[in-house]
Design a protein with these regions (language model features):
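Gly/Ser/Thr-rich loops at beta-strand to alpha-helix junctions
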Residues: 10-16, 216-218
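Small-residue-enriched flexible segments
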Residues: 16, 21-189
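C-terminal non-catalytic interaction/assembly regions of soluble proteins
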Residues: 128-293
Length: 293
């Protein structure tokens, strides 16, 4: 339409780089593949960086990537490895209207810091789908961060957590407060990988304990977190020798408001006949700083 300025929402990161080449007749697969790499800046280079620049040269049957910093270079391994970035399947990359098939993709080192990529194929889906995402408010979060180096407590940390949870439940059941979430994230013992079952990692000589409470109101979350923290601080576990507190707190006050908590309430693919009908283009003309009617 000849607009001088385009204001648009971004729903698919590679499209910012791929839209103009596709409009000009370049291969959709190559344009999207290049866009998927460029939208991460220089992460595909060595050393990688999300705050440095990468240049892409798109040709009819391939594209070339070149970092603009003399301190970085692209290698076939670094570029190919980027395909795993935030992906569970490096050969099949779904997106609007289809997916990129990288089974036949070829990476070639053409000089010390440039890599040539070819062979990417775009496979259209049976129909066009729009991704719909939405969230809902589930409550308010309060956390407390603490640590322990007591080897006896560390050896019994799982049973201690279960006992503390049981005591919290028993206390708040008496007040009719049952709709809450209480969790203990233990860093130094699968704090990062605890979401995956069956992973038994090394237990460190010290643990960081993050107590998290989510409830309907911030006041309830504060109270639950405070009670859980106090209970764990003074919990008399089996074999305990220490008579003072079980936990060390790096901050005072020990509890922190984290505010509103949301969760996905809508995560859906909507099949449509024409995706453009949901995103109409409006042209607005300005002259001398004023909008023309």
């Amino acid at each position: 339409g000849g607009a001088d300025v385009i204001i648009a929402g971004r729903s698919y990161d590679p499209s910012v780089f791929a839209c103009l080449p596709i409009k000009e007749g370049f291969d959709r697969a190559l344009a999207l593949h290049m866009g998927k790499i460029l939208e991460c800046a220089a992460i595909c280079a060595l050393p990688g960086s999300g705050s440095d620049c990468m240049f892409g040269y798109l040709r009819k049957d391939h594209f070339v990537l070149e970092p603009l910093s003399k301190d970085r270079k692209c290698t076939t391994l670094s570029v190919a490895g980027h395909t795993l970035y935030e992906k569970t399947d490096p050969y099949h990359l779904p997106g609007p209207g289809g997916a990129l098939d990288l089974h036949g993709c070829h990476f070639e080192q053409i000089d010390d810091n440039k890599v040539k990529i070819s062979g990417t194929v775009f496979e259209p889906t049976d129909g066009y789908f729009l991704k719909l995402e939405g969230t809902r408010l589930v409550g308010y979060r309060t956390i407390s961060v603490a640590a322990t180096t007591d080897p006896i407590m560390i050896s019994k940390i799982d049973s201690i957590i279960e006992s503390v949870k049981a005591r919290v439940k028993d206390n708040f059941d008496n007040y009719g407060i049952k709709d809450y979430y209480l969790d203990f994230k233990i860093y130094g013992k699968n704090g990062v990988m605890s979401m995956f079952e069956g992973i038994d990692g090394h237990i460190g000589s010290e643990l960081m304990v993050v107590i998290e409470a989510v409830a309907k109101t911030q006041k309830e979350a504060d109270t639950i977190c405070s009670f859980a923290r106090s209970t764990m601080l003074h919990f008399g576990y089996e074999g305990r020798i220490a008579t003072a507190g079980n936990l060390a707190f790096p901050f005072s006050p020990s509890d922190c408001h984290m505010g509103e908590v949301y969760e996905f309430s809508l995560y859906h693919l909507l099949k449509v006949e024409d995706p453009k009908q949901y995103f109409p283009v409006e042209y607005i003309e300005y002259a001398d700083g004023q909008r023309k009617k």
